[in-house]
């Protein structure tokens, strides 16, 4: 199962989190976010990582040109779209960056949002389902209604996000079978500052499932 830790801001933490077991790291390219990092900061965190770690930039309502430039400058392997991007935009981006994984994050609060998610599947590589918040795009600490997702079986891989922590991850995975999980605020001391003890506890809990 993929494990993505999002909102990385410090190079030394990126290396430590990868060594603890993360398969993907996320870097926030949204200037209004408290976890925002510049291209130079992303490169500093990405450069020492092993090749097998996915390096994903998180964007919201950015232009294709801006996204493409950041991918090139930072050596990103994936782009996560967390804004109001349309399926058509996702398709254009995927054609523009054919070697890069395209993830679309959707903030879910109703079955209608889940139906919308299905529309995206043919234009992207991976879906990410997050909790809805009217102001914030992610990292809110709010959980999804897991029960609503019981019958969610999209045609592409999907990641579960939204308020996941080392304390509730086993409960979430007992109810759902996502292809991966995405954590941010649930393993932090404060926005952008990851708590390595919590990250270690997360992988300890995940290891106990085997």
UniProtKB/Swiss-Prot annotation:
Top enzyme class: isomerase
Gene Ontology molecular functions: phosphoribosylanthranilate isomerase activity
Similarity field: Belongs to the TrpF family.
Keywords assigned: Amino-acid biosynthesis, Aromatic amino acid biosynthesis, Isomerase, Tryptophan biosynthesis
Catalytic reactions of this protein: N-(5-phospho-beta-D-ribosyl)anthranilate = 1-(2-carboxyphenylamino)-1-deoxy-D-ribulose 5-phosphate
EC number of the protein: 5.3.1.24
One Pfam family this sequence matches: PRAI
UniProt cross-references to PANTHER family, sorted A to Z: N-(5'-PHOSPHORIBOSYL)ANTHRANILATE ISOMERASE
The protein's annotated pathway: Amino-acid biosynthesis; L-tryptophan biosynthesis; L-tryptophan from chorismate: step 3/5
Superkingdom: Bacteria
Name the record gives this protein: N-(5'-phosphoribosyl)anthranilate isomerase
GO BP, sorted A to Z: L-tryptophan biosynthetic process
Organism: Trichormus variabilis (strain ATCC 29413 / PCC 7937)
HAMAP family: PRAI
